[in-house]
């Protein structure tokens, strides 16, 4: 059985074929997002100019002196250029001067992008004709308020100096927030690391307490009643004057839907239909989970965490995981939760819970990345690096006829049906 997986996002877009034995019981479900046609320039522009909860961007832009356009980094699948182009046309037609428009990569607490990365996100023309900068979460911040829990809310100084802020992002299931989108382009996108330490640690504490009580529900694709989302909205309101554009994408990273407008109102409208775009069935019992890590190849802990969910049930605690990742770039430096040595970890570093009693974690990639295993959260005694698919199948050789296997087309966006 041959299955084609989309791979090499931002690195050539070359798919990867995998081959499974014909006598295996393979579950491979196509997500709804892959059954829809992508939007063209005209459709994207129409969505932007018919927003939810606020006036059209063309009206908001009138009389504005400085405009910043925020976009996410290489750990997100957002096809930024396709959305940035109609935005720029709207701004220029509304009288905003070209030299007064800047782009800022909303990196959160990730490492900086290079010019080459900017071009992959925005295209050669935009990078050549507009100022494009990286956010730094440690410096050049201003206080915009104090949160209810008492911590300072710090945001990028340049962002706050602009009188119109536009955010471009993708709305997909998120491992700690239910869904990405909305004000997340600000928090953590262009926020200070101390502010985000408060917000992330509060959410992490809530999830840890749920796990201890045996009530843990993996948040991807769920609007759970927990602190992170609410605090992001609370802090976001302090920033103000943000026009947000969130897109749905298919597994080829093409825009299939747009929600735009007020960051809170468009977020909840999008959330109503987001989960169904990306959900698949989770088998009650499975022997092998093959999860593709393409969109967030440099944050493969997300896809790995999705695979681990399949082994959380009391009756399914044994099985192997294959993580497919062909990205040359490796794992993104994460200054809040990353690893910076064998004993040196970032301030909120934690590890994914692996409830399996037995089972290997096979990292299928032409590019060895031993330190990356720390970032992904694979325990050393489970880790196998396979450079070829033949090596993967050798590592899975104990599995014979009737093996139940689940293949996940894109671990970064999938959520399981309830």
Model-predicted segments: where are they?
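Short, conserved secondary-structure transition motifs
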Residues: 103-116, 136-142
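Short glycine-rich or small-residue beta-strand-to-loop segments that form or flank ligand, phosphate
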Residues: 66-77, 102-108, 289-292
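A glycine-rich helix N-cap at a beta->alpha junction
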Residues: 118-142, 350-359
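Conserved, well-structured core segments that form the ligand-binding/active-site neighborhood
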Residues: 128-285
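N-terminal amphipathic/basic leader segments beginning at the initiator methionine
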Residues: 1-48
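Glycine-rich phosphate/diphosphate-binding loops that line cofactor/substrate pockets in enzymes
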Residues: 52-68, 93-98, 280-288, 314-317, ...
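Long, well-ordered mid-to-C-terminal structural blocks that present hydrophobic/aromatic surfaces
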Residues: 265-334
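C-terminal non-catalytic interaction/assembly regions of soluble proteins
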Residues: 92, 305-418
